Amino acid sequence: MTSNLIKFDDQNKVFHLHNKQISYLLSIEDGGTLSHLYFGGAVKNYNNQLKYPRLDRGFSGNLPESLDRTFSRDSLPKEYSSAGEMDFHTPATIVRNPDGSNALFLAYKSYKIEDGKPDLKGLPHSWTKEDDEAQTLIVTLEDKVSKLEYDLLYTIYRDRPVIVRSVQVHNHGEEAVYLEKVASMQMDYVDKDFEVITLPGAHANERRVQRENIGQGIKVFSSYRGTSSHQMNPFMALVDHDTNEFMGEAYGFALAYSGNHKFEVERDQFGQIHVNTGINDYNFKWKLNPNEEFQTPEVLMVYSDQGLNKMSQAFHSLIHERIMRSKFKDQIRPVLVNNWEATYFDFNEDKLKTIVDKAKKLGLEMFVLDDGWFGHRDDDNSSLGDWKVYKKKFPNGLGHFADYVHEQGLKFGLWFEPEMISYESNLYKEHPDYLMHVPGRKPCPSRNQYVLELGRKEVRDNIFEQMVKILDSKKIDYIKWDMNRSLSDIYESDLPADQQGEAYHRYVLGYYDLLNKLVTRYPDILFEGCSGGGGRFDVGQAYYTPQIWASDNTDAIERLKIQYGTSLVYPQSMMTSHVSVSPNEQNGRITPFNTRGAVAMWGDLGYELDLTKMSDEESDQVVKQVTEYKKIREVTQFGTLYRLKASASNQCAWMMVDSNKNEAVVTVVNVMAHAQPYCTKTKLAGLDPDKRYKNLETDEVFGGDELMHLGFYDPIERGDFKAKMYHFKAIN
C-alpha cells in the first residue's frame, strides 16, 4: 500500500483518516453502530478519549434486545442513520420494504482501504492522477433482514483539507426494495454552536450569502426544480459565530450534482448538530432490484481553521485540479463578445459582421452567436429541438459566417439549448412523445418551451446526432449550453408506474450522459454551462464545463454580491462575467464603464452589448480594458483569491495572487458616495512579507508586510459606483 493516510485501531475499533491538515475519526460502537468522533484540524494520534458518554435519557430508546439503557442511537453521533431504528433525527436513508415497512437497522459488517479514489459511473466525481495522492476507506453497513448493504466511501487526499464522501447501496436480497431517500453523507457534531451559511437567490439574483443561527428544530435548504437552481445552490457551511474571512472554523459542504438536492441541518434536543446532504427525496423513489446497486453523488467536505477564505481556497483548488477535466481548465480564457443583449433575435449575417469587425478593432478574441440562429427562430416561441441553421438569417450557411469570423482573427462560439423542445418545431411534429409530460395532462410552458425526456437514450441520441452535424464541421471553437426553465410535469414514458419516482434523477443522468459524449468527442471545443445564468452553477457541472455563465444579471453592482457568493465555493476561472450597456438592461442602473470592467474582470471577461453603438470614448475604454486584462488575466483567472471586504458593506474588495507571490491584482469598489465620507483602508493578503512590491501604475514600492498590515487609504471620489484596480509586482 503506497499511502498511509488511513489507520484502523483494531483494539478500540477506530478509523483515523489523517494528513498534515485534517483528521477524521469514526468508530464501531455497540450494536455495530458506526459512530462519528471528530472532523477538524490534524492530530497525530487518537487515544480513545472521545467515546460518547453513556446516559439514560428519557424517550431515547435502546438497541433491540438490549438491557443497557445508557446506549441509544437517538443521542449517539453517527456516520449514517436510517429510519425505523429508534433514532429520531432526520434519517440519511429511508427504504420501503416488500412488506410495506420502512424498517432498516444498519450495522457494521466490514471495511477495506484502497489507494487512490474510485470513479463513479455516470456521475461527476473527484479523481486522482496518481494512486498515492489519496486513499479511500469503504465501510460496509448491512441490514441482516433485508440483506441491503450500504458502502460508505471516504476519500482523503494527501495534501488537501478535504474529505470526499458518497454512498453505494447494494441489494443482496431476493426481492426488490424502494429507496425513498439516500443521502450522500451524514455528519453529527457535539458541543458546537454553529451558524449556517447558504447561497439562496433567484433568477438574475443568484448565490446571495445568507448567514443565520441554528435553533432547535430542522432547517432545510433545497431545490426540487430538477436542477441545482438559482434559488438554492448545493452548498452549505457551518461556522463559528466569530468566523470571518480570515479567522475561525468553517466546515464547507458542496454536492457534486446538478439536480434536485437537499441539505438538512438539525439541532436536536441535546444541542447537537445533525447534517444530511444529498439528492432531494422529494418525488424520489428508486426501485432497487436484487443484485442491483445505487450510487449517490459525491459531497466535498472542507475544513478550515483560518476562516472562509481558506475554506474557499480549498474548494477552488480541488474543483480546478481534481474535478474539472477539460484541457481548457489551465488555459487562458478568451475575451469574447456575445450578441444577445446587442441584438436579441433581431439579426442577420450582415448585422453580425459589423459587430465582428468592431470586435476585431477593439482587440477582442471571440464572437459568440447566441439564441436565434436555428430553425425559423425569430422569437422564443419556436424551433427548439431543430438544430439546423436558419437560412433566412444565414443564406450562405453557418459555416460561411464562421469562416468570416475566423478570417478576422477571432474564434467562433455558438449557443445551444439541447434539453428543450418547442411545440412549433419539426422535432415535435416527428416525435411528440419526446416532450416530457404526464399522459392525459397538458404540460406547463415556461419561456414558451418544454423539456425533453433526456432519461431516454433515443431522445439523447437524436439531439446528439443533430449537434454532431454542426460540430463536425470543426468551425466551432466554443459552445454555450443553456437551459432556460425548471422541470415540471415529471414523467418518463418508458418507465412503469412504480418507477416514476426515478424520473428526476434519470433526467440528470441522461443530461450528464449527453454532455459527456459531446465534451469527449470535441475536446478542442470550450464548453460553457448556463441555465438562464447561474441556475446550474455547481460542482457537478464543473466536471464537464470549466466555466459557467454566472448570472443573466450583468449589472456590475448587483454582480458584486452574486460573484462574492459564488466565490465561496467556485474558482474565479469558472465564473464568466460580462460588461454590458448602461443603463443596465436588467435594472436600469447607470454605472461607470470603468467599474463595469473592473467587476467583470473578477471572472472571465467578456462583453455583452452592441459594440457598433458605442461612443468613441467607450470604444477607447474597451481597448484600454482589454489591453490591461490581457496583462493580468493569468493572475485574475488562476491566482489565489482573497476576499478583503464583504459585498454586503458599502465597499467590496478582493484580490488574486499568483502561486509564487510575485504578482497581485487588487480591486476596490465603493458603492455609494457620501457628503462626509469615512476614510477607509484596504489591507492586502497572501503576499510574501519579505518581498517588495511595485505599484505598476504609480511606481511606488512597498513591503509585502506593509501592504498586509498597514494597507493603504482608499481613494475618495465624488459619485456612486466607483472602482479602483491595483496591479503589484515583486521586485528584486
From Swiss-Prot:
What keywords appear on the UniProt entry?
A: Carbohydrate metabolism, Glycosidase, Hydrolase
Question: Does Nucleotide-binding show up as a keyword for this record?
Answer: no
The family database entries (InterPro entries) matched by this protein are listed as: Aldolase_TIM, Alpga-gal_N_sf, Alpha-glycosidase_related, Glyco_hydro_27/36_CS, Glyco_hydro_36, Glyco_hydro_36_C, Glyco_hydro_36_N, Glyco_hydro_b
Pfam families recorded for this chain? Glyco_hydro_36C, Glyco_hydro_36N, Melibiase
Q: Where is the active site?
A: 482, 552
Which CDD domains does the protein's record reference?
GH36 (cd14791)
**What is the enzyme's main class?**
hydrolase
Record function comment? Hydrolyzes the short-chain alpha-galactosaccharide raffinose.
Subunit (UniProt) = Homotetramer.
Q: What is this protein called?
A: Alpha-galactosidase Mel36A
Upper taxonomic classification of the species? Answer: Bacteria, Bacillati, Bacillota, Bacilli, Lactobacillales
Give me the gene this protein comes from: melA
